[in-house]
A protein has these predicted regions:
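Short functional hotspots at interaction and active-site rims
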Residues: 1-183
Length: 183
């Protein structure tokens, strides 16, 4: 199945993104002749992983967990967070991370009347959620969240910042042309 054959309104891209409490802006401004000063946490703290989905309508259900993604965490995300929100006939697309491969993943997805597709290796250009994660990380850098609670709050705000127009643009850029025109 390729982008030109399937209705892009049925596509759901799923991926994960790691973040931590020492993210800081990569550039800034200061008065002419003065050096910009910014303190950055030396201790990254534990990694927080965001499991999320994106459709042409925008960001879908997400889950933030401490640590990395395991098969058990991913299965729980599918079973309790993502799949209850999806209707039948959706095509769920993800990369081939080992945590995405257990047989139960396919069983859960197909049991809900959806289809599972894996992207070929080294093909993040075909996954519109990668661009959403780029925007999310930019927002997180500006937020300078230094505690887990502040990071989770900033993640919620960053997810909300992905607009319908953003999502449609991410899909277009990845080669999944929508049936209609961008608004």
């Amino acid at each position: 199945m390729v982008a030109g054959v399937v209705d892009p309104t049925k596509l759901v891209f799923v991926d994960e993104c790691g973040t931590h409490t020492s993210l800081a802006p990569v550039y800034g401004y200061s008065p002419k002749g003065e050096r910009l000063r910014l303190s950055v946490a030396r201790n990254r703290g534990k990694n927080t992983t965001l499991l999320a989905s994106i459709t042409l309508e925008g960001m879908g259900p997400s889950l933030a967990v401490e640590g990395s993604t395991t098969a058990e965490v991913f299965e729980a995300y599918l079973e309790h967070v993502l799949l209850p929100e999806l209707g039948e006939g959706r095509v769920i697309i993800m990369d081939s991370l080992p945590a995405h491969k257990p047989g139960r993943v396919r069983e859960l997805i197909e049991g809900r009347g959806c289809e599972l597709l894996y992207l070929s290796g080294y093909s993040p250009d075909y996954n519109p959620i990668e661009e959403a994660f780029s925007k999310i990380k930019d927002i997180l850098r500006r937020a300078c969240a230094r505690t887990r609670e502040a990071l989770l709050e900033a993640l919620g705000e960053a997810l909300s910042a992905i607009s319908l127009r953003d999502a449609q643009g991410f899909f277009e850029h990845a080669g999944y042309h929508s049936m209609g025109q961008l608004l």
